[in-house]
Amino acid sequence: MKFYIVLLALAAFAMAEADPNLEARAGCSQKGKYCNGGTFLCCPGQGSCKGNQIAKKKYSASEAPSTEGVQRLLLVTGYALECLGCLFSQTPGYSGSVLPLLNSH
C-alpha cells in the first residue's frame, strides 16, 4: 500500500513540474549542450550558461526538488535500507526480527 502512495505522489509531482508552455521550450538545449553562444538557448529552470554550455543548476532550500532529485533520493534510501538489512542479517542470533535484539540487553 505504501508503494502505491509513493508512486501516486511521484506521478502527481511529475505532472505538476511539467511546463505547460512547451512551444517556448522547443529550442532549448539539454544540459551540457550548446546554449546562448551556439545554436540553442538556455531555458528558465535549466540553469545558467557557463562558457558555451548550460551549467548545473544550483538549488535553494525553498525550491521543490526536481523529479531527478526525488528519484536519486529514493534510490539512495533503497540502498540504505538494503544495507541496513544486511547489517542485521550478519548479527549473531538474528532471526529476521529486530525485537530479539532489543530485548537482549
Swiss-Prot record:
Disulfide bond in keyword set = yes
Using the chain's own numbering, where are the disulfide bonds? 35-86, 42-83, 43-49
Q: Which UniProt keywords apply?
A: Cell wall, Disulfide bond, Secreted, Signal
Which compartment or compartments is the protein found in? Answer: Secreted; Secreted, Cell wall
Q: What happens when the gene is disrupted?
A: Affects hydrophobicity only when HfbC, HfbE and HfbF are also deleted. Disruption of all 7 hydrophobins leads to altered germination kinetics, decreased survival under exposure to extreme cold stress and increased mycotoxins patulin and citrinin production.
The role this protein plays is: Aerial growth, conidiation, and dispersal of filamentous fungi in the environment rely upon a capability of their secreting small amphipathic proteins called hydrophobins (HPBs) with low sequence identity. Class I can self-assemble into an outermost layer of rodlet bundles on aerial cell surfaces, conferring cellular hydrophobicity that supports fungal growth, development and dispersal; whereas Class II form highly ordered films at water-air interfaces through intermolecular interactions but contribute nothing to the rodlet structure.
What is the name of the protein in this document? Unclassified hydrophobin D
In which organism is this protein found?
A: Penicillium expansum
Give the gene symbol.
Answer: HfbD
